[in-house]
């Protein structure tokens, strides 16, 4: 039996040395030290030995098994190191090659315009107010002087979720909610940026989802001249210092009087071109003095407080500012379009 053990040890050490990968090495481990291996068979046969021979052979078996185990561990370490070196050689980085620049992202053109508008009005003392996009019918319509059955509701096809809940059609509900929180005490001076939703068919100038920024000022002795001065300052900061604005009479249920606001064409200086369609003016937003009914419903005394409101679409501002002819470009995630603004 002693000769058999010495022979097994010699065979195992030779096969361990010949193993050229970890799988072959594991096969040797299983073949000699596994439950069905020859070392285990020798241990099972020790029952036939005399009591005097048993401890001698047991010590010999342990020595053989220990020698094989140590050889396996040493070979495994060698093979693992070889694999690491092979992998490093295959993945080696040539530090003499020029580096690859990291592709830099940039702000979406709409984000640029929205942040620019926000910064302009924050600089004039406004704060940013926000509200829910899933809105109550009351705040979206009734609190803005649009009671149920009002014909002006037909002007805005809406996405209703229930009879009293809808996706807001403008950011004006934020104005109503903010005035309500003030509990009839001024001043209020906010802008309300956010997404709005209308049941429009998507085309070059319409989208079922778009953004709005509305502004509201409520205090004592607020006049139309304050509105005009504010919007003139906005137009000059946004489109150039030599810009002017004009008011045209219009109608909005929540303001009285109401106006459409045009800015003198920044492309031709007011002489007439294809951008302004030969008029010298470009429509940019709607505005007006807050209707007394809106003030009263929000808890303000309309005899003491007055205010003005205005609303604009950042998409339209961006289209005018950057010469974009289709609103859908903003929402199609086309990198060929978006990457043009990395240099803006």
UniProtKB/Swiss-Prot annotation:
Recorded GO CC terms: cytoplasm
Catalytic activity reported: tRNA(Phe) + L-phenylalanine + ATP = L-phenylalanyl-tRNA(Phe) + AMP + diphosphate + H(+)
Keywords assigned: Aminoacyl-tRNA synthetase, ATP-binding, Cytoplasm, Ligase, Magnesium, Metal-binding, Nucleotide-binding, Protein biosynthesis
Compartment(s): Cytoplasm
EC number: 6.1.1.20
Cofactor binding, per record: Binds 2 magnesium ions per tetramer.
Superkingdom of source: Bacteria
Entry keyword annotation includes DNA repair: no
Protein name: Phenylalanine--tRNA ligase alpha subunit
Gene name tied to this protein: pheS
């Amino acid at each position: 039996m002693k000769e058999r053990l010495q022979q097994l040890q010699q065979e195992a050490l030779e096969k361990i040395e010949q193993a050229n990968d970890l799988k072959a090495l594991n096969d040797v481990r299983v073949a000699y030290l596994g439950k069905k291996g020859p070392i285990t068979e020798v241990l099972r046969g020790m029952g036939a030995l005399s009591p005097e021979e048993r401890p001698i052979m047991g010590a010999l078996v342990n020595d053989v098994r220990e020698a094989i185990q140590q050889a396996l561990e040493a070979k495994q370490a060698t093979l693992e190191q070889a694999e690491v070196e092979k992998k490093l050689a295959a993945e080696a980085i040539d530090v003499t090659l020029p580096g690859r620049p990291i592709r830099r992202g940039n702000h979406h053109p709409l984000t640029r315009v929205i942040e620019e508008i926000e910064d302009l009005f924050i600089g004039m003392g406004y704060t940013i107010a926000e509200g829910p996009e899933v809105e109550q019918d009351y705040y979206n319509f009734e609190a803005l002087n649009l009671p149920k059955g009002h014909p002006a509701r037909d002007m805005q096809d809406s996405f209703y979720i229930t009879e009293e809940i809808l996706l807001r059609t403008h950011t004006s509900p934020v104005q109503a909610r903010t005035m309500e929180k003030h509990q009839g005490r001024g001043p209020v001076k906010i802008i309300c940026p956010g997404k709005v939703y209308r049941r429009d068919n998507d085309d070059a100038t319409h989208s079922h989802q778009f953004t709005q920024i509305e502004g509201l000022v409520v205090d004592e002795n607020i006049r139309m001249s304050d509105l005009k001065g504010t919007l003139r300052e906005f137009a000059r900061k946004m489109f150039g210092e030599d810009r002017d604005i004009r008011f045209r009479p219009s109608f909005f249920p929540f303001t009285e009087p109401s106006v459409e606001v045009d800015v003198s064409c920044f492309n031709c200086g007011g002489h007439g071109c294809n951008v302004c369609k030969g008029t010298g003016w470009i429509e940019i937003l709607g505005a007006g003095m807050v209707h007394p009914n809106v003030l009263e419903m929000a808890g303000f005394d309309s005899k003491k407080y007055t205010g003005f409101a205005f609303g604009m679409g950042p998409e339209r501002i961006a289209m005018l500012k950057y010469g974009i002819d289709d609103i859908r470009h903003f929402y199609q995630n086309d990198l060929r379009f978006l990457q043009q603004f990395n240099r803006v």
